[in-house]
Amino acid sequence: MKRLWVTGYRSYELSIFSDKDPKLTVIKYALTNYFKSLLEEGKIDWIISGANLGIEQWALEAAIQLQNEYSVHTALMTPYLEFSKRWNENNQMKYQNLTEQVDFTASTSNYPYMSPAQLKNYQSFMLEHTDRAVLIYDPEHPGKPKYDYEAIQKYQEGHEYPVDIIDFYDLQESAEEYEENHRQENNFY
């Protein structure tokens, strides 16, 4: 198995509050292209992510769309039970729909949230059960992904563990590429 851990910013950290936000289109475009590249090179066959609102859920949505073209499995992992319990009804429904679409879902803890140790255990689990990672993250703009990024760097000290970073410059390039591709598709002259 060749397993990829995908994580990154939460939706609020990117000021994305709607599924119709153009930034979301660009993020999914960038993730889809990244996944396709790894799939075509035979470097992954599982895309594994968390359930946080933002990059993690969007990555799984993009991966699920690729299952029509590629032989890739998807997994949604949570650090504790009842992960979405405090979310509003709409976000809980999105989470539920996602759990029904992925190939595998589980929690790394058998208990609801009790302590930050569950989050550390989740990071350890993800590192030990994946072969590489990608983060949509910019070290110049730290946020929640900073903790996963630091855990990955520490893990790399004793393990071969490739990590790719898609930063804001990469997203800007993806936005320009997306715009160019769609301008050509819509050019009727």
Swiss-Prot record:
Matches recorded under InterPro entries: YspA
Q: Which SUPFAM superfamilies match?
A: MCP/YpsA-like
Gene3D superfamilies xrefs: 3.40.50.450
Which family does this protein fall into?
Belongs to the UPF0398 family.
Q: What is this protein called?
A: UPF0398 protein LGAS_1023
